[in-house]
């Protein structure tokens, strides 16, 4: 028995997608959340590989890094290039020097049930910059903006949910191939979901 929310019954988008899946004999296995449940979190394993940041990771602090000193603008340009991001939103001074970085991929920067979590992480780990997937603009955005305008060396780079997590999913086939030897496994990039005008 499959679960179908009431609001989808008869929905044109749902019916067309269901037909596409059925006609092409596609099986879908949504595994993303399981990637986060492993230790270490496989999304961050992939992110660290892609950015070559393993050596910058703070032991025992899986979302925190100490990188070579750079500016917010330079860090943003690096992340945009490596993660294939078209647009980065910045709060704080773009010329601010940063070394201590927090990186909360996808919805992690929403706080995972505790909307103050990103701000507490920034404060408790004395982070210069928080790199985020998606944010609650009325909390984290305001906190970082206030800190920067009050003269503290604080900034935030927002890259989007999809682009910060897809890079970790890219490494799923490596892991999965070991579990199903002989079965072809590959990664298909979803790409940037937005168009920018």
Where would I find each of the regions flagged by the language model?
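Hydrophobic structural segments
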Residues: 1-197
């Amino acid at each position: 028995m499959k679960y179908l929310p009431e609001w989808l019954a008869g929905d044109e988008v749902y019916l067309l997608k269901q037909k596409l899946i059925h006609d092409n004999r596609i099986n879908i296995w949504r595994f993303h959340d399981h990637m986060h449940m492993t230790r270490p979190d496989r999304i961050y394993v992939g992110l660290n590989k892609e950015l070559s940041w393993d050596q910058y990771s703070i032991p025992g602090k899986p979302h925190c890094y100490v990188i070579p000193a750079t500016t917010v603008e330079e860090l943003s340009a690096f992340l945009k290039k490596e993660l294939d991001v078209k647009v980065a939103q910045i709060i704080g001074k773009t010329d601010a020097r940063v070394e201590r970085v927090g990186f909360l991929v996808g919805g992690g920067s929403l706080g995972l049930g505790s909307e103050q979590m990103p701000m507490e992480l920034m404060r408790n780990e004395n982070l210069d910059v928080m790199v985020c997937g998606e944010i609650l603009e009325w909390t984290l955005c305001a906190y970082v903006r206030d800190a920067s305008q009050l003269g503290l060396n604080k900034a935030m780079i927002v890259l989007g949910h999809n682009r910060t997590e897809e890079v970790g999913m890219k490494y799923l086939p490596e892991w999965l191939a070991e579990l199903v030897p002989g079965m072809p496994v590959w990664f298909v990039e979803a790409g940037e979901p937005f168009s920018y005008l």
